[in-house]
Every structure is written in C-alpha cells, then in structure tokens.
C-alpha cells in the first residue's frame, strides 16, 4: 500500500524486492501474484463490500441506433498509421519541445476526428483501437512535455541533464 489510503502499487513502481525468475526486483510474475493477493486481502479487511457502490463511471452508454458502418475505413487506417509515424518521428528516444508540441497539436486533431467516428458510426474494433491509440499517444506526449530533464531513454535536447535532487531513490547494498 502506498502513502495514499487505498492506493496500491505493484511492478517496478512498487519497489518490493521480489525477484521471481527475473534478475530485476519488482518486475516479475511472482510480484503480480503475491502483491495482488496481498492487496486484495488488505482491501477486503478494511471495510465490507458496499452494495451501493457505483458500477459505472459516468461513461455515457453508446447506442448505435441507425448508424452505419464507416464508409471511409481507409481514413481510419490512415489515422492509425499516422499515429505510428507521428510517435516515431516526434516522440521517439531523442525529443525536442518543438517536436513534442507538434505531436500534441496533431493528436488533438486526430482526437476530434476519432470522436466523430466513435459517435457517428457503428463501433468496430478498428475504431476502438484507434481511439485507444490516440488516448495513449496523447498521454505519452503530455508526460514527455511535462518532463524537464533527460533520464534513461527519455532524452530531450532542450533538457539534456538529470534533476536527481527531485527524485527519492532506494539504494540496496548486497
């Protein structure tokens, strides 16, 4: 459990020290099983399950009504490919603020186009995947734009140094 009540962390962010079959701690299937079970047990012990707990999160139900399948499937595939190229060209390992800004601008336009497909046509797996690609790409670009340092494979030529003083690290001695 993290310092926030009810929030649990697993995987690399958990820093549990469990190794499993991996050489890196907190990056194994063992952690998935053990930490998930411990988190479940902890949550169940905190309070009984509420029968009035919300089952939806204000996501409007989609009703296809008289909508048709998209007549411009090639546009969906073009947008799909554009996201891949955009992320490779502007948001790959070596980044600049200008390229990140260009990527964010284009992703906003793609988001509007995908929204039109999502609400105007019958949903297909390709539309859902395109919507998810735009969402994940937008999150990656947003996080990259907020980072004002270079760390690991996140190198921004506008911020070539590390800001180690901003990070609390755990050191283990063997």
Language-model segments: residues:
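Glycine- and aromatic-enriched mobile tails/lids
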Residues: 1-9, 13-174
